[in-house]
Amino acid sequence: MAEDRIKSKLRRPASIESTMSSRTKPRHKPSPMSILMPHLMVGESFRKYRPHGLRNIRMNGHLDWNQLRKSFEKQSTFHGISHAATADGKWRWFWYTAFTICLLALLIQIFFLISKYRQYGKTVDLDLKFENAPFPSITICNLNPYKKSAIQSNPNTKAMMEAYSRRIGSGDKTEGIAAALSATGGLHAKVRRAKRKAKGKPRLRDRRYHQAFAQCLCDIEQLTGDRKGSCFAAFKGKIEIDTNNTAGFMNLHTSRCLCQLDTVSKALWPCFPYSSWKEKLCSECVDNTGHCPMRFYKGNELYENIKEQVDLCLCHKEYNHCVSTRDDGIILEISPNDELNDLDIGKKIASQLSAQQEKQAEVTTTEAPTVTQALGFEELTDDIAITSQAQENLMFAVGEMSEKAKESMSYELDELVLKCSFNQKDCQMDRDFTLHYDNTFGNCYTFNYNRTAEVASHRAGANYGLRVLLYANVSEYLPTTEAVGFRITVHDKHIVPFPDAFGYSAPTGFMSSFGVRMKQFIRLEPPYGHCRHGGEDAATFVYTGFQYSVEACHRSCAQKVIVEACGCADPMYPVAEMFGNNTKPCQAVNMDQRECLRNTTLWLGELYSKGKEAIIPDCYCHQPCQETNYEVTYSSARWPSGSAKVMECLPGDFLCLEKYRKNAAMVQIFYEELNYETMQESPAYTLTSVLADLGGLTGLWIGASVVSLLEIVTLIVFATQAYVRKRKGSISAQSHHSVPVHRASRVSLNTLHKSSTTQSVKLSVMDIRSIKSIHSNHSSKSKQSILIEDLPPAIQEQSDDEEETTESSRTNGSCRYLAPGEDLPCLCKYHPDGSIRIMKALCPVHGYMVRRNYDYSVSNSEEEDAEDEVHREPEPFYSAPYEHRKK
């Protein structure tokens, strides 16, 4: 390579100039000294030669940092440095100061740039796509999870319902101060009765007015559903109706009423629904009548005097007076078959007291305290709280059954769905619906469950979606079911439907419309986000056959923690096989298991509220990376209208239609628009943006680019190489003693004299690898230049260490020492057949022929030798026959 050649121009000696003249014969035979002198002069000149540039910065045995700096300044593309290279004095300092300040500003901005990138911000791209969206899956449930007839046929579930009935029957109906005093035990009937007997007051059974339960008919306003006036009590098959209020049409509904029984007139009036009566503390009750005016205790008297001055009474704001409560708390039960004229109040009260005592004895003997505590009714007084606890107890009792037994206690598909159409076509019930059992709502049925079939709505609007006629069958409703209607869940077909969390209620007697809009979410993975791929493959995921969702993850983790802490599973969640075949649901009457479950659930709730759920292994529930949600809009209208045919009911048959108004509902789910939204997260600041901003900043402050940075890298590499060479050279100089060059020159002269008679020149120097060219200018007798490349380096003594030093010296371009008695190689160029192509004038073997003007091809230019060297293989060093040129 041209950069690896060592070029040196030397002044030719007079003897060489005379011998190298073109086509002239020498007057005498050249002496050996004339042949050796160029080599000696090249060796001396080579020591003085040092190429310029960043690669050769070692001068006089040390690193010349000043030369390095100057070379870098002249070649640098940094704006400030390049100006400083040509400036002097204070302007040089000015440019360096400006460059330093700009460099500091650049570093500060690079720091903020990296900090911004490390925040991993993201943006949300909202895109509205106008194309047919896939229709969602619809899961339909009855608000009543199990049929009452099926619950009563099972001993465990029947016991749960009986416990609830006993607890809800003993609930407190008092209000205000009466409730507070009753809770503290201050109003015991026995104490009050004892005090009244001591004062000689008459017995309560001899008074005129009594409280009584009776069946009644109430007139209900059709438009508002409000009751109009008092109700009419029924006894012995007759109904007492006010004849003055029969002019208009009466919409009568049966109800259970609390009435005032007048033993003198033998009448039940007034009657109001029992729920509308309130218990108060009356201060001016008349003992012999049982009548109390609307004057109540205000709380000004001392607690010790309350028992003697007040009475418990039931009041109604529409009646404007109260009826005193019996000391034993018994309220008469009047059936429609009772004859008021022959009614024996004392006998009636005695029979009710005996029945109540038997019931209490049965509760005491059959229900252990631990069972009562396990059921959770012990500290509850509110009816809503008691009902909620009863629903949970029923769930625990059913959870102990097998899957088939659970499904048999709930509704079948044909019992729940009466009619169905989709996109104005009839549904195929067995093919379009599948059973999905939910622990809260029992048997639910999912429409569009097949994941391999694509179901789409081709038009927007209620008529082109799913329309179903659902039947509740109120006669099979449990006492714990607080509302009549259905639970509708709109969800993606790949995830678990959770009707208790994400469902919508549709009441009976209405047409419920659910307008749907689809939204797709595409989230980023770390480090930009925390979405999760394939969470359904986790060891704790209990909803087999469904994809990952956040709610499913939370419930799976809760089930895992409960099983590990309590040894049993929560019946609200599935019991997966991963927990083992021995894992059973917690029992409803096991106090320890129920208490452990409550405490564990509270602990989990605290963790989630504080954001510390990550302490539970595999329970940090991130959002899925791809998710499809549905936004639902609800609206309703009264149904049926009365003018349309519903099942077997003809238009205008209001008595038949009333059955469906109380038990059925029309539900329709449809797309509001044939488009959907996609919300896709994308990095707010990418690596490409960082590089672009970095390039802009470096160009703004110091005018640099990537190529400018490579200049610094090159500077570091060259400086490192020079430093390593210096270290190796200093170590070699300290370890070995070098042989002087002039000694080798004297040995070579003696050898040349001996070999002159045999027409071969032998020098006592080691192999010279290659002498590239010796150029002669035959047209000019002035200065001649000889280009010598790759001169052999001098070596030390023959040893393993010296060989390494010699190899290093060769690569560094120093002269190699030739040992005494060693022949100089032939420098001529040969043809492939072995004949001489170019004869060198300084060849130690054939050079004398050139100098004697033999007619052979001679190299006369540097260009020819250089071109020949580049394009041809090096010739072997051996003596071969040569061909005489024909004249």
Swiss-Prot record:
InterPro entries in the cross-refs: Deg-1, ENaC, ENaC_CS
Record GO terms (molecular function): ligand-gated sodium channel activity; monoatomic ion channel activity
Described purpose of this protein according to its UniProt entry: Ion channel which is permeable to small monovalent cations. Shown not to be H+-ion gated. May be mechanosensitive and is required for growth and muscle development.
Outcome after substituting E677K: In n506; worms appear hypercontracted and paralyzed
Known outcome of mutating P134S: In n490; worms appear reduced in size with defective body muscles
Transmembrane segments: 94-114, 699-719
A Gene Ontology cellular-component term: plasma membrane
Bilayer topology annotation: Multi-pass membrane protein
Cytoplasmic topology ranges: 1-93, 720-887
Chain spans, region Disordered: 1-33, 794-815, 859-887
Gene Ontology BP terms: calcium ion transport; cell differentiation; magnesium ion transport; muscle organ development; sodium ion transmembrane transport
Residues on Extracellular side: 115-698
Glycosylation sites: N244, N450, N473, N581, N599
Pfam families recorded: ASC
Gene: unc-105
Protein name per UniProt: Degenerin-like protein unc-105
Tissue specificity of this protein: Expressed in body wall muscle.
Family to which this protein belongs: Belongs to the amiloride-sensitive sodium channel (TC 1.A.6) family.
Keywords noted in UniProt: Developmental protein, Differentiation, Glycoprotein, Ion channel, Ion transport, Membrane, Myogenesis, Sodium, Sodium channel, Sodium transport, Transmembrane, Transmembrane helix, Transport
Record's subcellular location: Membrane
Taxonomy, superkingdom: Eukaryota
